[in-house]
Amino acid sequence: MKYDVLIVGGGPAGSMAAIQLMGSGLRVAILDRAQFPRIKPCGGGISCRAYRRFAKLEHVLKSVPTNLVHKLVFESPSGDAVEFSADGPLYAMIRRLEFDNALLNHCKAGGIEVREDVTVSRLEVGVDGVRLTSSADEEFFADLVIGADGVNSTVAVQTGMRGPWRHNQIAIDGTEESPRTSLNVNPDTMYVYYGYGGGYGYGYLFPKASHVNVGVGYFLEYFKRDVSQKPYVQHLDFLDHLKTTSVLSGQSQRENFHAYVLPVGGPLERISRDRILLAGDAAGFVNGFTAEGIYYAMVSGEHAGHTALNAIRNRNTTAEFLRRHDRACETEIGHELRKSITLQKRLFANPAVIDSVVRFAKRNATARSLLARYGVGEISYEELKWRMVTETLPGYLRYQFDKVWRKATRFSGTALQMPGS
C-alpha cells in the first residue's frame, strides 16, 4: 500500500502529527503495534501549559478524566521536604490509557487511517520512497515517514539516526497505576523524591481522577551498578516509606505494576534526514529535570506533521528541506530540554546539593515560587538562574550573616550589637 505520509506510533506525538494532516487530501496512516486503548506505563503528569498551547484541542483534552493538582511536595535525600503551591493548578494528571485513546480517536474521526496490531520490524529508505515491513511481512510504502515510535524507536535506529542508548541516557522506571480505592492518597498533592534510594534515584506519587501512579526510577547506569533489588521489591520499599510518612495508605496491586525505560539524556543531535522525521521519545524529547515527556511529544509531533505537509506539497523530502523540523523543535523546546539536562546533572551528581536547595526553598517564598514556575514551564532556565540571584540572594546573605552573628554572640557570652546599631 502506498501513502504520502506514514506515522509509526499512535501515542501523543504520532496523533499530533496526524492532526496536522487531517483534511489535507494526502493519504496518511498511523501504524501502531498495540490495540487501543492500551496500557501505557507512564507517570501521567502534564504541565498545564499544554492546555493553553493546544487550545484548539480543548474539546478532546477535556473529554479525558483529569485531576488538577495545586500542591507539590519535594523531598530531599535527607528526608527534608518543602511544599510548593500556586493559585492555579501546577499539573494535570491523566491516565495514558485514556489520554492517548482520546487523541487517536480524534484522528480516526478526522479521516486518518489507523492500523493497529502492526509492528514495524524493517525500514528501508530509497530514492523513490520508504518501504516498511511488518512482523507479519505486510509491506507499506510512503514518500515520508514520521517516527513517533517511542524510546525503542525502530525508525530512529534503522535509519541510523541513533545507535543503542547508552546507560547514562536512559532511566528505568517502575510504576504502579492502581485505583485510589486500593491506594488512598490526597488528590490535591503530588510528591517528588529526588535522590531516593541513592544519588541517582527518584520517586514520585501522582494522584489521578480515580487512580494513582506511584513509582521509583533510576538512571540505568546506576541501577545496573548499584541496585541489587528487583524493581518491584524497590517499589514496595518506596510504598512503605510513603505509608510511614502518612502520604499513602492501602495495598499494592502487583498486576498494575510495570517497569519501562525512558530517555533522559536530552534530544538527539538530528531529528530529520531524507524522508524521515522523528518526534516524542523517539527523538529524546523528555525533560531531564521533571521527566515529563507528553507535552514535548505533542509539540514535536505537531511540528513534524506541519513539516511533512509542506514537504509533500512542495515535493521535497530531502534532508535539507526537512531540517526545518529540527529548527522548529529547537526554537520551542530543544533549548529548554538541554538546559533541563544541565540541571539534572548538577542535582543528581551530589545529593547534598538537593538537600541545600530544599532547605533554602523552605525558608524563602520567592525561591519556592521560582522553582515551581520553572518546573511547570512558565519560566526558562536562564530566567530561573537570574531571578534566583537577584531576588533571593540578598535574603540568603542576610540569613547567613544572622546565623554567623548568633553563633558569635553565643561564643562570646555577651550581647554583641549589630553593625550600625
Locate the predicted segments by residue.
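Beta1/beta-strand and adjacent pyrophosphate-binding region of the FAD-binding site
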Residues: 1-11
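N-terminal Rossmann-fold NAD(P) dinucleotide-binding loop
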Residues: 14-15
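Glycine-rich FAD pyrophosphate-binding loop
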Residues: 19-41
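N-terminal FAD cofactor-binding segment of flavoenzymes
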Residues: 37-73
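Dinucleotide-binding Rossmann-like beta1-alpha1 core, especially the glycine-rich loop
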Residues: 52, 79-100
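Predominantly flavin-linked oxidoreductase catalytic cores and closely associated redox partners
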Residues: 106-248
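FAD/FMN-dependent oxidoreductases across multiple families
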Residues: 122, 222, 228-307, 313
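C-terminal helical "tail/cap" subdomain of flavin- and related membrane-associated enzymes
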Residues: 309-421
